[in-house]
Amino acid sequence: MADIYFPQFDLIIEIDEPYHFSEEMLIRDQIRQNDIVQALNCKVYRVTISNNIEEVNKQVDEIVAGIQNRIINEKFVAWDLYSEYNPKTYIQKGYIDADDHPVFKAVSDCCNCFGAGYKGFQGSGTGHKFNSSIDIKALKFYPNGAWNNKLDADEEHFTEFHIDPEINEAYVEKRIHELRPELALFAHVKSDLGGYEYVFKGWYQLDKEKTKRLGKVAYRRISRIMPTYYPVSEESPNVIAMAFDKGREIGQFYDEGTVDTFHSRYPEYKVVLAEN
């Protein structure tokens, strides 16, 4: 658990009391910090507690000044816990971006970002309702029974691997020849707020050559952004524009304000008005 977490600023503050300074605690703190950064994609500031109260106050003042500066110079959006975990937040925007660190409490919520419309428990994923090339999948990237999946530090590549050679070989063949070649990936991680959650990592594509070479299923990320969809059972608003990256649709929009916000944030992507 972090000492102080400001989700509005992707910022965590850790208070280092004297007992943190042992070699063992320093190692444990570094491991924990790495886990937090991976899970929350945030910056960590540390306040070192000592007998010098002036020095402690100086550290605190510097952090407070930094937060105040961001409030003044950046567009401040208050954190809403309900919206943070609600698929509708991303459905209404028309896209989901891994750089925003979207998190969800259940696999069904992950699937619902792409129009699944699930009401209850869902296993580890499902097929995309609007794109027959994509599966939606939640994976654990830590020791997990017979599975040993690995996500690279830069999150551009990951592998799926079963420790039983026969099962692994069968899965490799099935993934290459039968299953959908692309994934909307969510990583199962320990939440800094307690429990576990699912973090969107992006849009990935099966790398067949690498898979054959490694003997384990390998993927590469093709986009951090994916379009979201209203449930198939609901009537959705009219799409007024779409965003593309190298010919791949990455967003669809229902109002001019969202189009303007997206275009301002991502000028490198092409926005095309929908035909009436």
Question: Language-model features: where?
Answer:
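Short beta-strand-loop-alpha-helix junction that forms the active-site gateway
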Residues: M1-I31
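Switch/connector loops and helix/strand junctions flanking conserved nucleotide-binding motifs
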Residues: F21-E23, I53-K58, E197
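A short beta-strand motif that forms part of the nucleic acid-binding face
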Residues: D16-Y19, N51, V189, S223
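Acidic, glycine-rich low-complexity segments with interspersed aromatic residues
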Residues: A98-E197
